[in-house]
Amino acid sequence: MVLIRVLANLLILQLSYAQKSSELVIGGNECDINEHRFLVAFFNTTGFFCGGTLINPEWVVTAAHCDSTDFQMQLGVHSKKVLNEDEQTRNPKEKFICPNKNNNEVLDKDIMLIKLDKPISNSKHIAPLSLPSSPPSVGSVCRIMGWGSITPVKETFPDVPYCANINLLDHAVCQAGYPELLAEYRTLCAGIVQGGKDTCGGDSGGPLICNGQFQGIVSYGAHPCGQGPKPGIYTNVFDYTDWIQRNIAGNTDATCPP
């Protein structure tokens, strides 16, 4: 009964935000070339595989499950086939994953902090996105973006990033859809109650931006993508700001919150 009440309230919230929402990431609209200056594309020997967020000239935040033994990061990218004059490529110098992470659980502390081998220079298509100053609230309008699949079942990867607006949902919605989502995991639940808008395969590690603040990291979701009862699950960035700042300051022994 409680869940039915939650879903009813969220549907009302969703309808109130409908006019603010763009088209779908899945089957939807190309991002404006100037709205993702902080978006990082991860490539390895097989090609593009994850996204990330530039938070200052030397540091990138992504998902822990995007870790790979051999990868590069490209910034200033829009089309993967058309070179921007200010694109920059970097290698990871150091990688930080929560030392108290349970490696058998992808949803547990799914965050990775990367120090670049060389600072990034701000340019027309490159600029960092600051860490959040406050936590997000349920009902917030959130922006998702990435080069992930734009079709929900058979993966179709675009050359350009796609964007959409979704809403931050009550955590109970995701707990109902994902029995494996434990209450202690520091995650956010975001999507559309009636389905159809979602991040998908290849969007992992990219940002969830709520009311202009970097609040989440694409972590986990259902297949096919875009199912209303199973919204996307995002690592809650605000809960890790202290850990991020301590590592940037040189305290590499810092532990993440439990």
From Swiss-Prot:
Keyword Signal on entry: yes
Entry function: Snake venom serine protease that has fibrinogenolytic activities. Also possess esterolysis and amidolytic activities. Selectively cleaves Arg-|-Xaa bonds.
Family: Belongs to the peptidase S1 family. Snake venom subfamily.
Keyword Hydrolase: yes
Disulfide bonds: C31-C163, C50-C66, C98-C256, C142-C210, C174-C189, C200-C225
Reported regulation of activity: Inhibited by NPGB, leupeptin, aprotinin and PMSF, but not by EDTA, SBTI, heparin and hirudin.
UniProt-annotated glycosylation sites, renumbered to this chain: N44
Top-level enzyme category: hydrolase
Biological process per Gene Ontology, one example term: proteolysis
Protein name: Snake venom serine protease Dav-PA
MF terms in GO: serine-type endopeptidase activity; toxin activity
Residues of the signal peptide: 1-18
GO cellular component terms given for this protein: extracellular region; secretory granule
Protein location: Secreted
